[in-house]
Swiss-Prot record:
Described purpose of this protein according to its UniProt entry: Involved in peptide bond synthesis. Stimulates efficient translation and peptide-bond synthesis on native or reconstituted 70S ribosomes in vitro. Probably functions indirectly by altering the affinity of the ribosome for aminoacyl-tRNA, thus increasing their reactivity as acceptors for peptidyl transferase.
Protein name as it appears in the record: Elongation factor P
GO CC aspect terms: cytoplasm
Gene that encodes it: efp
Keywords: Cytoplasm, Elongation factor, Protein biosynthesis
UniProt similarity note: Belongs to the elongation factor P family.
Length: 185
């Protein structure tokens, strides 16, 4: 059992006898009494999103999942295909299951494939991935004074903010939890 106050984005839980992935978890505390934990849960089986409020101190069952190392191969628009590194078995996941993760997938990227009851249900990305900048504004002398950054589009379609010195064609490291630029690769 896991305390609802410890729920984070990406956690897998069992709620009302169905497995859900936590999309969002926000804590709200009132002046008196206990707080509320408002969550958005996505059913791994049906894909439906449910908003659920828990009282602080409640506990939910942690899903019995297993992780296996896999390599991302390709996608055909509807499904993303992965190969287990130990047995070379191939599995596919529907595109709607990988809403945020798809922006970090490049060919041959190693990920953890998440299994529930023997079936793949999701992936866990590495914390940092290397992506190529395909579109950004050119750098001009003197524009670093203001700090901040400029918008950039990466090879997977992810849009992020990069420092002014980053140019088109450069490889950068991106945090998969937030989508933020970390450093040049």
């Amino acid at each position: 059992m896991i305390d609802v106050g410890d729920l984070r984005k990406g956690d897998m839980i069992v709620y009302q006898n169905e497995m859900y992935r936590v999309i969002e978890a926000n804590k709200h505390f009132m002046g008196r009494g206990s707080g509320l934990i408002r969550t958005r849960l996505k059913s791994v089986i049906t894909g439906l999103i449910k908003e659920v409020s828990f009282s602080s101190g409640e506990k939910v069952e942690e899903a019995d999942i297993s992780f296996r190392k896999a390599q991302y191969l390709y996608n055909d628009g509807d499904h993303y295909y992965f190969m287990l590194l130990d047995t070379y078995e191939q599995y596919s996941l529907p595109a709607q299951e990988l809403e945020d993760e798809k922006f970090y997938l490049t060919e041959n990227l190693e990920v953890d494939l998440i299994f529930f009851n023997g079936n793949p249900v999701s992936i866990q990305l590495p914390t940092v991935v290397v992506l190529t900048v395909i579109d950004t504004e050119p750098n001009f002398k003197g524009n670093t004074v203001s700090g901040g950054g400029k918008p950039a589009t990466l090879e997977t379609g992810l849009k992020t903010t990069v420092p002014f010195f980053v140019e088109r064609g450069q490889k950068i490291k991106v945090d998969t939890r937030t989508g933020d630029y970390l450093e040049r690769a």
